[in-house]
Regions:
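Generic non-transmembrane alpha-helix signal with a bias for helix starts/N-cap capping motifs
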Residues: 29, 42-43, 113, 199, ...
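Surface-exposed charge patches
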Residues: 34, 47-48, 118, 204, ...
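Long amphipathic alpha-helical segments
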Residues: 38, 43-47, 52-175
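C-terminal regulatory/effector modules of DNA-binding transcriptional regulators
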Residues: 149-152, 165-310
Length: 310
């Protein structure tokens, strides 16, 4: 069962809806009755909304309707209804949410991570803020635990995997991947960069904008990139250079290889007319001439600059 407690209050003529999501595993959608309770209307009203296209739904084989979190939030925004988390939940700011997510990631509880992200999203936190102000600081905090010898390398890797799993479960719950603007994007880490969480975060942001994202993940070689580009037309390539303990592409020992790979990618982009985006916390060791060929970003939200570049 979907363990969601719903509280409705009227304030200044507006309906404010509070949700308290239970500790058990979250379902990916709500039924007509649950949506009716959520908005304080009967089921027939929800059915009329759905039939008229006011609120999107997915019809099931048995004739029932399913409503995604994404579509519920979109509808609430259009109608001026404020969705909020239960007043008992005080974790809607980074200062209080981040330590709890880190704590549970270290406990290997991906369900808590997923639940927290969904609560934040339903509470009005934008996807861009979720990536910049919550998930990234969580990753920084986990790295700090490792740097301060509070956890082992293995524990750091597992905690990151837990965050990754929670994030991808969140994606399945709320991100509308049916949007399609007809554009294709390739996302990747270069060789010597192992973690793919930043690339996953960029993928979620781009897919929410309607881009078809082909995520190569980590440790992608130039040979593989050439193969992919020769077989499919891409509008843009996103590369992320990490500087954490398990990433070495920006270290002195590997920087020549990294610069060489970036130069090859620039040549491919020129040949196939592909826009280039390079993200990361720092580009200090990257050849400055090469950087001129990239649209640079240091925050995940800045990846959406792609919408403004012709």
């Amino acid at each position: 069962m979907h363990n969601v407690k719903i509280f409705c209050k009227f304030r200044g003529g507006a309906v404010i809806i509070y949700l308290e999501i239970g500790e058990i595993m979250l379902k990916k959608d709500l039924n007509t009755k649950q949506v009716g309770n959520l908005f304080g209307v009967d089921e027939s009203t929800v059915r009329r909304w759905a039939m008229s296209g006011k609120i999107k739904c997915i019809p099931s084989a048995g004739g029932h309707r399913k409503f995604s979190y994404n579509d519920i939030v979109d509808f609430a925004n259009k109608k001026g209804i404020k969705l909020n988390i239960s007043a008992e939940n005080k974790n809607l700011n980074p200062k209080s949410a981040i330590p709890k997510i880190v704590e549970n990631a270290l406990k290997q509880d991906y369900k808590f991570v997923e639940k927290s992200l969904i609560e934040l999203y339903l509470g009005g936190v934008q996807l861009t803020s979720l990536m910049d102000d919550f998930i990234e600081p969580v990753l920084v905090s986990i790295q700090n635990h490792l740097d301060n010898n509070k956890i082992s390398v293995a524990e750091e890797h597992i905690a990151r995997k837990i965050v990754s799993k929670g994030l991808n479960q969140f994606k399945l719950s709320v991100i509308n991947t049916k949007k399609d603007n007809g554009k294709h994007v390739l996302t990747l880490n270069l060789e010597n960069d192992i973690p793919d969480l930043p690339i996953d975060m960029i993928q979620i942001l781009l897919e929410d904008e309607g881009y078809n994202v082909h995520n190569c993940g980590s440790h992608t070689s130039i040979r593989n990139i050439k193969s992919l580009i020769s077989k499919k037309n891409y509008d843009a390539i996103f590369i992320y250079l990490c500087d954490r303990q398990c990433c070495t592409s920006t270290l002195v020992d590997n920087i020549d290889k990294t610069n060489s790979d970036l130069e090859e990618i620039i040549k491919l982009a020129d040949k196939y007319e592909i826009k280039l985006f390079l993200g990361g916390p720092s580009f200090e060791n990257i050849n400055q001439k090469l950087l001129k060929s990239f649209n640079l970003f240091t925050k995940y939200s800045e990846a959406l600059l792609i919408n403004k570049i012709k």
